[in-house]
Amino acid sequence: MATPVRDETRNVIDDNISARIQSKVKTNDTVRQTPSSLRKVSIKDEQVKQYQRNLNRFKTILNGLKAEEEKLSETDDIQMLAEKLLKLGETIDKVENRIVDLVEKIQLLETNENNNILHEHIDATGTYYLFDTLTSTNKRFYPKDCVFDYRTNNVENIPILLNNFKKFIKKYQFDDVFENDIIEIDPRENEILCKIIKEGLGESLDIMNTNTTDIFRIIDGLKNKYRSLHGRDVRIRAWEKVLVDTTCRNSALLMNKLQKLVLMEKWIFSKCCQDCPNLKDYLQEAIMGTLHESLRNSVKQRLYNIPHNVGINHEEFLINTVIETVIDLSPIADDQIENSCMYCKSVFHCSINCKKKPNRELRPDSTNFSKTYYLQGAQRQQQLKSSAKEQKSWNKTQKKSNKVYNSKKLVIIDTGSGVNITNDKTLLHNYEDSNRSTRFFGIGKNSSVSVKGYGYIKIKNGHNNTDNKCLLTYYVPEEESTIISCYDLAKKTKMVLSRKYTRLGNKIIKIKTKIVNGVIHVKMNELIERPSDDSKINAIKPTSSPGFKLNKRSITLEDAHKRMGHTGIQQIENSIKHNHYEESLDLIKEPNEFWCQTCKISKATKRNHYTGSMNNHSTDHEPGSSWCMDIFGPVSSSNADTKRYMLIMVDNNTRYCMTSTHFNKNAETILAQIRKNIQYVETQFDRKVREINSDRGTEFTNDQIEEYFISKGIHHILTSTQDHAANGRAERYIRTIVTDATTLLRQSNLRVKFWEYAVTSATNIRNCLEHKSTGKLPLKAISRQPVTVRLMSFLPFGEKGIIWNHNHKKLKPSGLPSIILCKDPNSYGYKFFIPSKNKIVTSDNYTIPNYTMDGRVRNTQNIYKSHQFSSHNDNEEDQIETVTNLCEALENYEDDNKPITRLEDLFTEEELSQIDSNAKYPSPSNNLEGDLDYVFSDVEESGDYDVESELSTTNTSISTDKNKILSNKDFNSELASTEISISEIDKKGLINTSHIDEDKYDEKVHRIPSIIQEKLVGSKNTIKINDENRISDRIRSKNIGSILNTGLSRCVDITDESITNKDESMHNAKPELIQEQFNKTNHETSFPKEGSIGTKCKIPKYRQ
């Protein structure tokens, strides 16, 4: 018996073989069902029998192997069966090859029996047709690969259709049916060509019988249809409609127009112009007739100088030459703009009576050349005589008008030449004779002139002629007048001709022109400045008296240095060496280097910082190992809760920047932020900080920071005193970040207290922009792991947006208008400012409208200053002043020793003693940043809806569940949730609970600046200060904090993670000591009533 493993192996191999057999049988069946096998083709019986015999033999071998496999015993090895199965696979491959050969033989029989019928065939490439040409047999035509992609429904495009069809025939090696020598082609080829050209014709184009199957008749029918609609007069008008000048700078449109005219003549030339010259000369005259007189000479000169390209037709070469000439001459006319004509609505002035055609009388031959070619016999002779009379009369009128001008006082402006020549030597400045036998040639080879010399002609280019330009000009006595190149004139002086060639000039000067015999002239005295007689000045060389001569004298370098007032040694040596003094001096140098102690002391300077020295230093360190840091501030602001300082750290290698804003710059704050930044770099970027550069500020040179750097093994490099350039990278980045933040605040019309969010946004953007020194993104360069950055993930700072309100009520809008600030580093969302609630929240459910609107209507209304939150001092001047203060802080941020008002200036000695006694007790609001005094109440909860009950129900969330442990952040959030204001609530009426959604109350609570609040909140005794106006006056006089008012003046950032513990002693103290200290303060304290600072409050216990 066979084992389970052997049975499984046998079944798998058997199934694979059966699948291959069935797939091959299906393939053979599909081959039999192809269109070629369904044709009436006789197949020999022997070939069919051979196919069946091979198939039966294969099945017999397969059945024999299966029977032999079943007879194998359990001890037999299965290797023998695998070898036999391998041989069976080889047999299957042989049978497949024979099947393919048989199919090819059947197809060959079909083609031999039906040579005159077009059949479809299929191979690995696709469907194809077989046909014979005059030069080859059995050519294959694949319709998918050989596509004729031109379609037309217009009779006007028949020449283009025939031209593309001729290129298609030549490309795919069909017989050229357009040749007169070819009369008959293969019927299969004829059927293919008829099918292709009929696909190119539109359905609405009725030019012939649709049942026509002869390609020659189809082509003749297309030509006859086109000739019947385009007679001699039609073609003459088509040529006369086109006028090409230097304003036709659209090369694609110009080439399309001229090629269409050329094709029109090529397909009907042999039938209509039998007595005319050959097609080549006729088309050349026709194309030259479309050119303006100012352009024709330049084209002729280019055709004469440039050899003809053998690879293209003569007409294509001529059209390309015209286009190149127009392109070369068009930049000269800077004041000309290519527009459609206002009369004929065309770029080429295609109307015969167009008023904008410049100088129509200048093209007498171009308007009549087609008529003279087409007219025959007496009519042609009569037309020639009439045109000659018109030419003579036109010449007479020109001669009469030319008598007024004197050729010696005129200058010719040549638009087709690049060389300036003159016959008047007196016009040339700095003239020099030419020793070489230089000769210039015109259009003809026999019209050469010799050059005798060269100089410069000064062109008047201003009212006072103070900015004259010089043109290199050759002196040719044989020339009749002075010729100035229009191209050279425009290049040097930017003087160009107007559209109608009536003026020559630029923005400063304009000169009238006169066209004489088709040549542009200007007056010489208006264009050229003649050289004056006293232009050369001979300088008088000073000489000493012949009777007096000074003897040579020796002098030491030290003596000369003292005599010349302690000036530079090198200047003294050069002055004596070059004999600038009358006496002859011999300078004696000391063997040792000269040293002047007086100069060294008096002229001492700072050390020079060479350009790129810091870059060379940064390349020696790996990314993230070397940093430079500095502090910016203080930022002047009337708001006490505005952060005033910014710490910046920049990587010297990758230019990655890290910024943070703070209320102060003491050692504890700066050290905590540096420690946080270093830990972030080591954890997120997998980099090791080894070196930090900073200045000698007290915030960087204290013992705490030095101890931390020593513990981390970081090398702290300090700059020299007052050597700010040594820390120039941090200084430069401070300027970059602050100017970016100032720009964002200015364009968004936000207050200066939002500058910390603008700094965060600017820092994130700078880290994701390529730096010009490294050529990389700083974020990608510093990270050891690959980082992906998306541009669309950045939102525009200060723009309007809509965020989802998760606290919205039913039948109320679920969106809140907000202002985009910056990315939240502690979440995947963005920070938004909600003006209606005066809050800053983080959300990733937002919608941004189209902010790419017109800048003139953006930010026309300051929505951030609503009537609810604005004070009487808020206006546009205050906004400008806040941004100005930030800019002034940038300029003067190095001056950190600004006078700070002390508490002694605000309070009396009795009040200060009370503040000092309260300072020893820890305050639960030490972790709070701002100028709000958070109020608590211990009023019992009642059922009446009055003010007292509302206060008690609101504060129950603080006193409930005393067994829970609250962190500093949770405690602060509870304190923030208890902020109340009762200025707008009617105490006599009921309070609707729907107005308490945001945990805000309306109560007249007076605000205390944060400087005083840190000492007051959590105090044991109440400071009894009844004169509120006196405190306000004292604060105003010292410019500290903001004016005490009764309105809400603070924006609470409920997502700000920067609320840190300001009292580290409180943070590090034991829970038992903290509880003991709070138990001492756990009793009611009487604050002044409404109208004075504070209110009745009770400090809750610290929960363990």
Swiss-Prot record:
Residues binding Mg(2+): D630, D695
EC number(s) reported in the record: 3.4.23.-, 2.7.7.49, 2.7.7.7, 3.1.26.4
Main localization category: cytoplasm
Disulfide pattern: none
PTM statement from Swiss-Prot or TrEMBL: Proteolytically processed into capsid protein (CA), Ty4 protease (PR), integrase (IN) and reverse transcriptase/ribonuclease H (RT) proteins. Initially, virus-like particles (VLPs) are composed of the structural unprocessed proteins Gag and Gag-Pol, and also contain the host initiator methionine tRNA (tRNA(i)-Met) which serves as a primer for minus-strand DNA synthesis, and a dimer of genomic Ty RNA. Processing of the polyproteins occurs within the particle and proceeds by an ordered pathway, called maturation.
Superkingdom of this protein's organism: Eukaryota
Region (Ty4 protease): 381-501
Annotated protein name in UniProt: Transposon Ty4-P Gag-Pol polyprotein
Organism listed in the record: Saccharomyces cerevisiae (strain ATCC 204508 / S288c)
Source species taxonomy: Eukaryota, Fungi, Dikarya, Ascomycota, Saccharomycotina
Gene that specifies this protein: TY4B-P
